[in-house]
Amino acid sequence: MITKEQKAQIVAKYGANKKDTGNIFVQIAILTAEIEDLKPHFLANPKDNHSRRGFIAKITKRRILLQHLKKENFELYNKVLAELNLRK
């Protein structure tokens, strides 16, 4: 789980201002940070299927946001992929 401070840093880095949490770039960046934070847990606990459900939900939400961004603003989509080191 990422802390409030980490989330605030992400919002400050990718948002227009420090309260711009609705920006799609910020939402994708926060979900990516949460996903990266949970990966070691599933490597250590491969049978934790209850938590895996929430993990997959985060991945799905990020994928849906990326699909929407690709349809609406392809240049920003490519920027998001490059800055967050995501592959598509």
From Swiss-Prot:
Keyword Ribonucleoprotein in annotation: yes
Record-linked SMART domains: Ribosomal_S15
Record-level Gene Ontology MF annotations: rRNA binding; structural constituent of ribosome
Protein origin, superkingdom: Bacteria
Classification via InterPro entries: Ribosomal_uS15, Ribosomal_uS15_bac-type, uS15_NS1_RNA-bd_sf
Gene Ontology cellular-component annotations: cytosolic small ribosomal subunit
Pfam families: Ribosomal_S15
Keywords assigned: Ribonucleoprotein, Ribosomal protein, RNA-binding, rRNA-binding
Any one of the GO BP annotations: translation
Family: Belongs to the universal ribosomal protein uS15 family.
Annotated HAMAP family: Ribosomal_uS15_B
SUBUNIT field: Part of the 30S ribosomal subunit. Forms a bridge to the 50S subunit in the 70S ribosome, contacting the 23S rRNA.
Full protein name: Small ribosomal subunit protein uS15
Species classification: Bacteria, Bacillati, Mycoplasmatota, Mycoplasmoidales, Metamycoplasmataceae
